[in-house]
């Protein structure tokens, strides 16, 4: 918390301690400056006052800033040693009109829990008492002053006022006498060492108060004595409080902090201000005093100042301050809500808000929404929080809506639907599985039937508009605000629930009733959400079939519920016919398409309706039922019309003949002249009359009409196809595979022409025809290519064919190999224009020439490289790794081809061709995009390149790797992330390897690869101590210190993986001889390098040591910090039936306790087996209290 732009950044923990009255300021001479001298000036003034000169010994101590030793030496050589004390007392007398502004501020800050001032000072002067005299009275100041060995014990009732640990001077105005002073080295030794009363006082003080040093430098004598005493105690006593020091940065914060950090003090640095170097300190302390005295006022000011602006314009310091201001103060969130405009603050403060519980979070959000019901940003924020939906959130929004209704009706509806959606979103899948278990076990209770249909049925879902659909400023309908839909979960575990006891005769009717009620309720919600309107019904359109059908696959929404209802229908009719008819009658009475379709489906069941009843009901149904639902219409006809009476059939056909020709008569013709009304009318009549004609003879009039339609629409002159009954038809998901029939059936000379024509097709499979043909018959495709002259117009066809050659490297048929060789020779003679156009695929063929057994033309590489150098740069973006770019580039492929050619020469025992040396050098120094890619490929195989020519590697390639530019950094990344080095290469490139490791920001496997160079070098130094390596253990350790955290974690992973590669019976020796020493040699010992990720990897490393597990635990335990994850993985110790815990129970318990002991709050399913193994192997440990605490983390599944 920074209260001045140049002032110290006060930790929030310190501010909290100040508010609790748990902080004591320990004040030095700087507090009284410049009125009184500091220790250095005091020494100079004492010498002047006494008329003495410093001896060489005294001057040596003076130059070392050991002023207490200077005065000690002086007092020893004076005849009257008291002269030193008297001279110092004279120099430190309080001025006639003292300025106590600094002391006033500190007295406001340094107070106990009940507000009494408590200051500890090593100053002899009484300026603090003078400040108390002004603020209280002279008597109070006198009473509250204590000095020397009469100081009160910290924490006691008397521990108040001004405590002079080094003594106090006389103050006649306050009637205070002088006490023994601690000024010389001998007196310091007495107070802190021989008698030790000052040391005991400070130790007790540190156990009950946080200490803030002000007015000192790190080299001041009081600081050195005090903190050396405390540091010794801190190693043995864990309850010592923190020590802070207020100090100037002097323009170099790092250098200023170092001396304090060496004394285990947290420095709070301020920057000096021109003309008033200490102004920022005292201004900050005054601001801190104002905060401590009026915390609520200051909290409110901070909140208002910070949240009135957007999160994007705030600093980390601002956010930290805001979190402190709001922390543990739910009453201030109303203040936050009234001033917050940026929704991002809720994400920024998510952890703080969550600490108050779900109910408070919901209230905060709802209150903020209510301040701007018609604000689209607030609504979109609410949508984001729907994912964490809860009943509390729903209740809070409804409550605000009731108390403060939106002015706009559309917005009110949107918010009410959102509140409803929030309640539905709180659905818990785990409860569904528990429900299934209860339903299978029985008996089934009524509430579980309700839970079942609720789980199957859809719920309202609200999503933000697509990115290119910003919400309207003045919405006229809900879709202007957000995307509303009805969605259901994938409830596969409930698919066959009707076969469980829930589907028994005594339950099935209630299930049907509850399902129908749920359907009706959710349809009304959908209507409220404007998903059902006069013209459009999204719910109906989203259900291809109300019965189980392939077209329902991948559909959600209302599909599961409607299929569940139709599946339960025949079972319910068998169990209770009259009750089922009553439910079906309810469907017909509902004003929804889906319920109408369910009623129509019920007409197909003989148990519910006679054939005449079904056909009569269909004939007299409303317009939507009769004309809109072809699938259900045809299903009724096919199931019932054959058994129906002639009269019933006649009435049905008559309605078709009367109403059919009038369909769409009121619709206007399209402007484009397409007679869609006539076509749609013909199709509606055709599908219905055709379905009827399948089972009965149509009347002549109907037959004539059907014939006319078939004549008019020749595409309808057929039987009904199933897809005719659906408004949309899905053919399923399938891979796109080029269609080659037309190409294959043509003559070779015609195939390219056909391929060109197919490429213009609207069918993607036609467009992919040539590509697929090249894959299916590459020899035939080559024949087609050869039938045309090698010209620029056919280059695209050649490119496609050439690109498939590398993927056919395993084809060994003589014909195929002949064709490739012939193609290479042909293209080797091609014009430069052709080579340039085909350089990419040709380079990849060169790269795979060995596998393809190709004899490349002598000038092949040179021509391709010349063409490659003309290629433009490729913008890959920041997401593509450097080496991924290389392997997909022409330059990278040609580099690989050249290196392979050189390797073949060496494998055959030949000297490397001089021309290839020249090519390698030419490629490396090329300042083109292809040159950059080729250099990266050479860096990937640096050890090989170095072995071929260390001159080329060092003189030409190394400068590019060492360059301080983007390419240099990318090359160093390839160097360390994709390589392993022999000793000679490591020695020559050690500095760049270390730099690459320091620069790497990779994670996971790539980070481990980078770290492996450090580990490999040090392991090798222990394995083969006589072999010189390029990276020493000291360099490896320093590099790990400077590298990213992921690199350090990667180093541990590499050690674990390599250790586990050893056979089980060799792991102990590998740990003892290699990996244990390597860890001790390279791992930083600073506590600052401990982390949760490090701790987890150290845990795994210990378990990889095999029978050396005890020794590994002993060595690694200091580096295991408490795990911080919510879910803990102890599998490395639990595997193989907790074998290590059985063999080494004490070590296993120590390791698990270090990782999972307090304050760990995670849970794990691994720990029970480990603890059981420990207890079984060593029964005495069963009563160990660590075991009891660790068992609290166990989770059983």
UniProtKB/Swiss-Prot annotation:
Keywords: Plasmid. It comes from the Bacteria. SUPFAM superfamilies: DHS-like NAD/FAD-binding domain. It holds the Pfam family SIR2_2. This is Uncharacterized protein y4cA. It comes from Sinorhizobium fredii (strain NBRC 101917 / NGR234). The lineage of its organism: Bacteria, Pseudomonadati, Pseudomonadota, Alphaproteobacteria, Hyphomicrobiales.
